[in-house]
Amino acid sequence: MTYEIHPLPIILMSDFDIVVIGAGHAGCEAALAAARLGHKTLLAVMNVDTIGAMSCNPAIGGLAKGHLVREIDALGGEMARVIDATSIQFRRLNTSKGPAVQSSRAQADRLLYRLQMKSVIEHQENLTVSQTEVNGFIVEDGKITGVTTTIDEKISVKAAIVATGTFLNGLVHIGLKNFPAGRLGDGPSTGLADWFYDNGFAVGRMKTGTVPRIDSLTIDYSELEAQESDMPPAHFSFDSQGKGYTLPQLPCYITYTNEKTHEIIRKGIDQSPLYAGIIQGIGARYCPSIEDKIMRFPEKDRHQVFLEPEGLDTVEVYPNGLPTSLPLEVQIEMLQSIKGLENARIIRPGYAIEYDYIDPLGLRPSLATKKIENLYLAGQINGTSGYEEAAAQGLMAGINATRYLEEREPLILDRSQAYIGVLIDDLVTCGTKEPYRLFTSRAEYRLLLREDNADSRLCQIGKDIGLLDEDKHQRYLIKQAAIDAGCATLDAISIKPTAEVNRILNDAASADLKQKSALSSLLRRPEINITFLQKLPLTAGDKEAVIALANSAVCQEVQVRIKFKGYLQRQEEQVQRFKRMETLKLPEDLNYAQLSGLSNEVVEKLSTIRPISLGQASRISGITPAAVSVLQVHLRKLNYLKSNDKI
């Protein structure tokens, strides 16, 4: 019997407004934002079981990263709610320092986090999930009109968001062995990587790494220092206030490497793919491998290691501080030289991964590419590292892709509004040659961009764009009213300088009160806080009001607003000067080569980056004050700026 063979037909799926490629932290936020804003969205993922997967450490937040999580939440994103529902430890960091640099970090149950995010995705209206691998785009008249897949699907779309993480030409290294993978256990995306190369995008190569996972049953915790959760644990999401935690809170444990550990690493360094010259990608400066730390800092006799549980129902432990790509046998020997890990068994080896990224200088502040106006990039493909940085970009890409389809101006948060604005402005203005990590030190106005006031800064924007529901917006308004009332209360209550008052102040190493003063005036003293004010001899009604404020959810923000009033006003004045520069828009088609007074280097940088404002131009590396003055003069000629305006 003979059979007639027919070529397989191209499968035509339904048309979609937006396709999101990749379902990590960037892809999930992008897809949810697009769908919640009313657009028919397709989430294309190579394996639906990895939606929301935490590929590296089982934690959300940290220094500056906690700020991002709160900002994502204030705008209507999902990450904060998911970590609140799946957290097994919560800690406030930098509490001995100023409010600008205090941040939150939560350990997650890795499995529950992924399943919770997957459930949110699956139940979201307007959002379709498809297990498929996109390998290219259909481009007509300079715009994307569809995507193709490895199984010959052809899907019509009006905009696309690429959030592929480490999957573009991913290559895993363990010792001198390497193999293609997007992460250990998952294949890479090669077809889509080829598409970016073939279509003239500036593609670079980066590298990151992760730690070996070890069996908790083989760890001796008896002599290790426990690090307990803050109790009661706090929350990231403003939705979670007062709801309480349902999961048990687990401790982490602290141990250290030692000279024996370092000697084992030095002996095996010739088998490190990084030091053998096999890895070409640039690694993360602020998350170096343990072998890199040993070789670069030989004077250090030990390095801290945090043993972090990966969940309630698993024995896997994440030894934070030990990312490595050394051979498995060296990893075992290294681990077993560390106190508490003498009998440790590795469940999953540590490894390094190289991957393609797209130069973010090719992006607009909306995260749309300059080459194709309806193609958006978010996450590690833009050269960043970290779940939180990825999620923030995904949220903004999702918002702006919908606004593009609605022919509305993109939402661009500036550096004075949010850490999200700092992150994106750094990427599109300065670019990056190594995995970018956000720090509070990158923000010029960090006292205004505190973690505790993310809702004050961004909830109204979230409501205006349509992501923040009315219930949450009303809670935000109630909180703002409570802050205002708290400040007014401390302004209204005054106290006289009596012997008892001065004794109480002296006990706190505070100077005598010389004249009748409002409690808000006393609160501006560095050694005084709202809790201390309860000790003062107040009337029954005033004491009750102070106690209520000290125990309220707005206590911290009231305290910061009063205690740092002068500094906040100063930063607000700086912001006004900054905003004047940002409002001076540069024409998109400006021919910089025709402007006299600009060097060839300046012309090249301005022509490449195409800054949207005089402010952005001034932040480009190598753009001198003289060059900014040339641009300012040109804007005057174009009637963009009156000659007597001051900057």
Curated annotation (Swiss-Prot):
Q: Which residues bind NAD(+)?
A: 283-297
Keywords for this protein: Cytoplasm, FAD, Flavoprotein, NAD, tRNA processing
Name the positions where FAD binds: G22, A23, G24, H25, A26, G27, V134, S189, Q380
Which coenzymes or cofactors are required? FAD
Q: Where in the cell is it found?
A: Cytoplasm
* MF term (GO), any: flavin adenine dinucleotide binding
Q: Output the GO biological process annotations, alphabetical, semicolon-separated.
A: tRNA methylation; tRNA wobble uridine modification
Q: What superkingdom does the record give?
A: Bacteria
Give the disulfide map: none
Q: Does the keyword Ribonucleoprotein apply?
A: no
Q: Does the keyword Cytoplasm apply?
A: yes
Q: For this UniProt entry, what's an example GO CC term?
A: cytosol
Family according to the record: Belongs to the MnmG family.
Quaternary structure?
A: Homodimer. Heterotetramer of two MnmE and two MnmG subunits.
The function of this protein is: NAD-binding protein involved in the addition of a carboxymethylaminomethyl (cmnm) group at the wobble position (U34) of certain tRNAs, forming tRNA-cmnm(5)s(2)U34.
Name used for this protein in its record: tRNA uridine 5-carboxymethylaminomethyl modification enzyme MnmG
Whose protein is this, by species? Answer: Desulfotalea psychrophila (strain LSv54 / DSM 12343)
Please spell out the taxonomic lineage of the organism that makes this protein. Answer: Bacteria, Pseudomonadati, Thermodesulfobacteriota, Desulfobulbia, Desulfobulbales
